[in-house]
Structure formats: structure tokens, C-alpha cells
Amino acid sequence: SCRDADRISMKRDEILKRLGFGIPHASRIRVIVCSDLKNEADDQYAVIHHLLSPSEEICGIVACHFEWFSRRVQQQTPIGEQWPFVKEDAEILRSRRGKTMEMSFAEGKKLLALAGIDDVPLLRGSPSEIEGHDGMFSEGAEFIVHEAMKDDPRPLYVCCLGAITDLAIAYKMQP
């Protein structure tokens, strides 16, 4: 068992060098990973895979919401007629409304700490889906725009492992 005090924190490049991976900076693709880390169990593995892929320069991770289902449940009446789960399950989904992005953010902090990676920014995404109006903002969307506008000859890829809300907001901010 490993105590927190025993953990080594290091830069991502240091980890890749220890693993024997060395790809020139100019050959690495720029990637922002958007993930609803707390929604499904596979997202943590996918994010770590990106972080340890030597061909990628991970610019940042955006913690995304997973709100669509709880909103759908909220709109259904009566619950049992159209959904295969019981009322208690629907109540759990309703209780998460507006909180899922923060759940993903906390999971992202935990994941980076467990991996010992301290140089990849973790940003908060939108707390919910877009409801058709302008003016939505998220730290993650602002980061996407900032990275996209950088003077860098390499293209920027945004890998969405969950909701595309922050990418849509970024596009609305800077088409």
C-alpha cells in the first residue's frame, strides 16, 4: 500500500522519458481531452492513455457534465411508463442535476494525483447542456479557444469522451 506522502509527483515528460518514450516536440499532436470522468468507468483509462501517449501533447483536460439523462428523466411523467428503471433510480439522477461536472472535476483531480502528473491543466467545463441561448461560458470552452488561437503550426485536436457542450460553446465564442 502506498501512502500519499510516498507518492512522487512529476511532469508528464519526465514520466514518458522514464518509460523510454522520446518524440520530438514538433512531431507531437496537440490534444485537449474533454471527458465526463465520473460518468463511466472507461473514461479514466482513456484519459490516462492520452496522457501516456508519447505522440500527443496534452494541452489540458476539460471536466464535462453528464446531464442529458437527468434532464430527460426530469421531463418524463409518469416515470415508470417510458423508462425501464424504478422511481428510486430516477430520483438519484434528478438529485445529480447541475452537479455532474463538479463530480467529473473531482475525479480528474484524483486521477492526476494518482498518476503523479502535475503539469497538465484540469479545467471546469459547462455545468449543463446548452439550451439554445447565447452567452453560455465555461472555463473549458475559454481554454479551447485560447489553445486554438495560439500561434502554433500544429493542428489542435479536441477529443470528446463525453458531452460536446464545451466544444460547442468554444465554437460559439470564436467561430
Outline where the language-model segments fall.
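N-terminal acidic, glycine/proline-rich low-complexity segments
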Residues: C2-P175
